[in-house]
Amino acid sequence: MASLFKKKTVDDIIKEQNRELRGTQRTITRDRAALEKQERQLELEIKKMAKTGNKEACKVLAKQLVQLRKQKNRTYAVSSKVTSMSTQTKVMNSQMKMAGAMSTTAKTMQAVNKKMDPQKTLQTMQNFQKENMKMEMTEEMINDTLDDIFDASDEEEESQDIVNQVLDEIGIEISGKMAKAPSAARGLPSASTSKASTISDEEIERQLKALGVD
């Protein structure tokens, strides 16, 4: 019972109109089929009367055939009109739904615009850009520090390689033998000691000659 008093929506009205138009189209199609059947019967009657030579009957039947064909042609016109109305109804329904969708979208956009503060949005974007720049600077500093560490390590390794090469050239190994180098040469006179001894002997001989001692 509640459905009887329920207010019809636009969609309900359009659906009813479409049902009525489809029903009208079916009726027109049936009527045209009946007229075509009568048309064939009249054509047979006219041929029959013509064979018997009944001219008056042929004239009467011919007039009926003309009227029937006019009526059949009118069914085509009516059918075309019904089809056009059905198409217009579908177009109107589509336009109505599109308008409804646009209205809903407009309301949604309006609600979003009310909640969205342009100043806050701009500030958020600026803060994001600022923090992003900080992150990039921090990352760059970390990369520079790591590069310095690795470069220093490389320089230390290069320096050690040079020291090892020099020690190897003079016959001293770095693996603990540098401490033994002085003791190994302890029994040998140094260059400075030998030179000092030579100078001392010459000085003694000079002094002896000065004294007349051979």
Curated annotation (Swiss-Prot):
Belongs to the SNF7 family. Its main location: cytoplasm. PANTHER family: CHARGED MULTIVESICULAR BODY PROTEIN. A motif (MIT-interacting motif) lies at residues 202-212. Residues 179-201 are annotated as: Disordered. It is found in: Cytoplasm, Cytosol; Late endosome membrane. Probable core component of the endosomal sorting required for transport complex III (ESCRT-III). ESCRT-III components are thought to multimerize to form a flat lattice on the perimeter membrane of the endosome. Residues 190-199 have a biased composition (Polar residues). It comes from Gallus gallus (Chicken). GO terms for cellular component: cytosol; ESCRT III complex; late endosome membrane; multivesicular body. It comes from the Eukaryota. This is Charged multivesicular body protein 2b. It is a peripheral membrane protein. Signal peptide: none annotated. Gene3D superfamilies: 6.10.140.1230. Probable core component of the endosomal sorting required for transport complex III (ESCRT-III) which is involved in multivesicular bodies (MVBs) formation and sorting of endosomal cargo proteins into MVBs. MVBs contain intraluminal vesicles (ILVs) that are generated by invagination and scission from the limiting membrane of the endosome and mostly are delivered to lysosomes enabling degradation of membrane proteins, such as stimulated growth factor receptors, lysosomal enzymes and lipids. Pfam families: Snf7 (PF03357). Keywords: Coiled coil, Cytoplasm, Endosome, Membrane, Protein transport, Transport. Residues 25-55 form a coiled coil. GO terms for biological process: endosome transport via multivesicular body sorting pathway; late endosome to vacuole transport; protein transport.
